[in-house]
Amino acid sequence: MKQKYIILVFIGLVCVFNFCSIKPKITPPEKPAAPTTARYRLVWNDDPTTTITVVWDQLRGDNPVVHYGRKDYNKKWEKYPNSQKPTRTTPGYRGMNTHFTKLTDLKPDQVYYFIIKDSEGIGERFWFRTASARPQPFTFIAGGDTKSSGTALEAGRASNKMVAKLRPLFVIFNGDFTSGDGTNAERWQLWLDDWMQMTTTNDGRMIPIVPVHGNHENGDKTVLHNLFDVPYQNNVEENIYYSLTFGGNLFHVIALNSEVEEGGDQRAWLENDLKRHQDFTFKVACYHKPFRPHTVRKSENIYQYEQWAPLFLKYRLSIGLGADSHMSSITYPIRPSEEEGSFEGFIRDDETGTIYVGEGSWGAAPRDNNDDKPWTLRSGSFNQIKWFHVFPTTDDKPAHIEIHTIITATFDEDENITTYGDDVVPLTEKNLFEIPNNLNFFSPEPHGAVVTFPFKEKK
């Protein structure tokens, strides 16, 4: 009996030892799946009140679909009431598998949430706002010229981040997206990565872009169509110029192309477009190369001036937006003239003239502003964006546009860069027209931080 007891105790001890020595199997946490989509951008290439084009790089997975609606269901794709498959793809172009999905029949001045679902996953939820079909105040940002490396890349990123903080209705990017001739795949991928990551607001709002062709896209003059699905004219894919309308008859923007024939078909198209929209309150033209650069390192664009400037006067263009020179400038209202008192084909005319605004330096190294004219209101050498506030007529104020120049980076004499904006408090959907603290304006007197169209002289 005693022997059996000892055996049972021994067996029990062995069992306890073995049980204690067994290590429970621990399942490591699953790594989040790598995203199947990247490089999102929203493009306005049609009626911005009812359409928008969602563009992205499909990294892997099949059968992607954009699910969207006016209520936020986060990533519960099946709850969104609308869905749309890609309407176009450009597989392999610039090393990407770009998909375009055009959303139509949207309601004006509304928020829409969207996600992309494919065979392998669900993307992040983002949102956008359509433009109003009636005259309502809005803001937009304009600028151009970025580079793909060094301090110029850093400066461009500072400008990108300002977009997210100021929440404009849209951005006009006025050409020269990358270094080189626009054919380098890695540079485009970098630009698109930065655009998505830095111009999206902290609550997921994406800002539509209105792309314009610049000389650094001349290696392939179809590139903006193949990466942004922008329109072209006369069945010629290189003839990238188009126009958009905002707020009923409040605001019309014309995206021209200074890198293809400015006369001929483009001039005819421009005159027809201006004629059809001549009764709009504001008409704005954007194009990469300015007529009269404000730096001696850039040549005059006389043929372009001859083709377009007379039409701008004839149809009373409000503002002309140029880039290319890598510096900042704003003119008084000017019109084409060879009369006494004119200079380089322009004369100041506060009643019928156009205010010309520019000239690039979103990120590219600033050039000296060493070619001012008698009709130059202000110029400067720094990285910058232009922030426009557009207001329709009210009971107590006529329609007007306020133009702000925001400095995003400067360089000292040793080429050391200082960027601005990290301490700027982001705007919200409730205060889109407020001026946030710590915004670094270019504000020489007597006009200070704001230049207004129609122009108002300040003493």
Identify the meaning behind each predicted range.
Residues 72-98, 139-157, 181, 225-234, ...:
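Acidic/histidine-rich helix-loop elements
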Residues 16-142, 395-459:
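Acidic, histidine-bearing metal-coordination/catalytic regions of metal-dependent phosphoesterases
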Residues 145, 175-176, 214-215, 256, ...:
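Active-site glycine-centered loops adjacent to acidic/histidine catalytic or metal-binding residues
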